[in-house]
């Protein structure tokens, strides 16, 4: 028999669990398990977590999951409270794994002639939905890479359930005998909402807490807000919550544990941003910054702060982008020649493709996969149809994927390996023609 959600939460708090593979917080590893984890509170765990709160006068959903979970969520909620209407939902932010699960609840309301659930969200959420509608191709490509999704099977959604009521800083509503306090914070997104229900001492942080190093650096996504994130975590820690419903992964039970998890996460974020800004204030290049910022040792063994999704170096890059813009400080990167042209020049200087491939293979054999990656990319850029170059590229990136804990890094490397197996650099790109340009 599978462990209950509460039992799994206890195991993972004590460091007795596999958050890299078996119970990764951003993967459907619990087979859409649902459980009443506190009186009147059902938690559904899949890629993202959803909770339903029974107010005594209807249900309130805290997030709604993705479209891929919508039927399962509906069935679990209906099995738990078959006669209770879903009257409201709170979107913690605009990401599609949190906002696309209301369809059957809306349809149920329509069929019975009552109002649809009222959706609460931050005032910036609709703008993000409109951004998504303008960038469906881009978001399909980057998520295919990030999650290892087959391009032929994954499409980015182009319709969204827009909120009915939005707020700017704080909003409180009551339902039944319960109070839902909505607070704005900036973190993974600029439209984050964390919710506190004081009567239950119940905290819903959304993706401000995900049982991992925060998703504060994601290499393909829009700006994250590291210092603001830390502020929101400390504000949540001050609530005195006894149950925290993580945006991904498992709940945390007990006020002391919740305070520890939130403040440790805030301290980690503060450390990364402080170190990054100290180096930036010396006027150094991004290359120095990403290789000199370190994660303090005191966080190394905390089970809820492992780099199983994002990576600390990605967070450093995001801090740089927020305070320093897109330029990395290297003058030749300001108005560069196309990469394929650069690669061809370097390969020629090195004595040709075969010599570069031989050196890349030796580096890989010696365990220097980072440098091997740089060299093999030059060969594929210089001669895109070179079979041996793609064969070596496949091998190098397969090895890089296996050596990383971060699933973002693993999946991006694995995507490159799969592409080279098919003689391509990128399976998600629908146009792989090399860039050509003249200097203006």
Please identify what each model-predicted range represents.
Residues 42, 90, 120, 165-167, ...:
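Hydrophobic/aromatic beta-strand patches that form the interior of the parallel beta-sheet core
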Residues 59-60, 66-68, 127-184, 228-240, ...:
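Metallo-beta-lactamase
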Residues 2-10, 104-155:
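Binuclear metal-dependent hydrolase catalytic cores
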Residues 40, 53, 63, 93, ...:
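Divalent metal-coordination and catalytic microenvironments
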Residues 28-83, 194-206:
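Conserved beta-strand hairpin/beta-sheet module of binuclear metal-dependent hydrolase folds
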Residues 1-22, 138, 238, 251-440:
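Accessory terminal helices/loops
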Residues 34, 57, 68-118:
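Active-site metal-binding motif and surrounding structural segment of the metallo-beta-lactamase
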């Amino acid at each position: 028999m599978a462990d209950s959600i509460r039992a799994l939460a206890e195991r993972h708090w004590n460091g007795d669990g596999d958050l890299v593979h078996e119970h990764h917080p951003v993967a459907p590893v619990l087979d859409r398990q649902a459980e009443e984890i506190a009186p009147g509170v059902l938690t559904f765990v899949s890629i993202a977590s959803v909770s339903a709160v029974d107010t005594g006068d209807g249900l309130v959903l805290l997030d709604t999951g993705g479209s891929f979970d919508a039927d399962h969520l509906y069935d679990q909620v209906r099995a738990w409270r078959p006669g209770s209407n879903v009257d409201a939902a709170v979107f913690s932010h605009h990401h599609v794994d949190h906002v696309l699960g209301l369809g059957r609840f809306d349809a149920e309301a329509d069929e019975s002639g009552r109002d649809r659930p009222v959706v609460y969200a931050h005032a910036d959420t609709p703008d993000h939905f409109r951004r998504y509608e303008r960038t469906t191709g881009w978001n399909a490509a980057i998520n295919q890479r990030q999650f290892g999704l087959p391009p032929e099977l994954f499409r980015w959604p182009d319709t969204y359930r827009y909120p009915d009521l939005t707020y700017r800083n704080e909003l409180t509503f009551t339902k039944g005998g319960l109070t839902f306090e909505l607070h704005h914070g900036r973190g993974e997104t600029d439209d984050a909402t964390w919710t506190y229900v004081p009567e239950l001492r119940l905290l819903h942080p959304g993706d401000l807490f995900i049982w991992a190093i925060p998703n504060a650096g994601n290499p393909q996504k829009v700006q994250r807000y590291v210092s603001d994130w830390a502020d929101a975590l400390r504000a949540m820690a001050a609530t005195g919550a006894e149950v925290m419903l993580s945006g991904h992964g498992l709940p945390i039970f007990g006020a002391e544990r919740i305070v520890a998890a939130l403040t440790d996460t805030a301290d980690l974020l503060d450390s990364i941003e402080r170190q990054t800004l100290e180096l930036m204030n010396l006027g150094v290049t991004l290359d120095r910054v990403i290789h000199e910022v370190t994660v303090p040792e005191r966080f190394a063994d905390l089970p809820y702060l492992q780099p199983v999704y994002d990576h600390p170096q990605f967070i450093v890059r995001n801090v740089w982008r927020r305070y320093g813009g897109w330029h990395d400080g290297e003058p030749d990167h300001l108005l560069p020649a196309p990469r394929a042209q650069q690669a061809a020049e370097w390969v020629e200087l090195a004595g040709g493709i075969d010599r570069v491939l031989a050196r890349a293979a030796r580096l890989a054999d010696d365990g220097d996969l980072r440098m091997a990656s740089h060299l093999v990319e030059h060969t594929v850029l210089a001669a895109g149809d070179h079979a041996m170059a793609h064969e070596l590229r496949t091998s190098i990136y397969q090895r890089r994927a296996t050596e990383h804990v971060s699933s973002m890094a693993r999946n991006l490397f694995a995507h490159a390996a799969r592409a080279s197996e098919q003689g391509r650099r990128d399976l998600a790109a629908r146009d792989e023609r090399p860039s050509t340009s003249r200097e203006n």
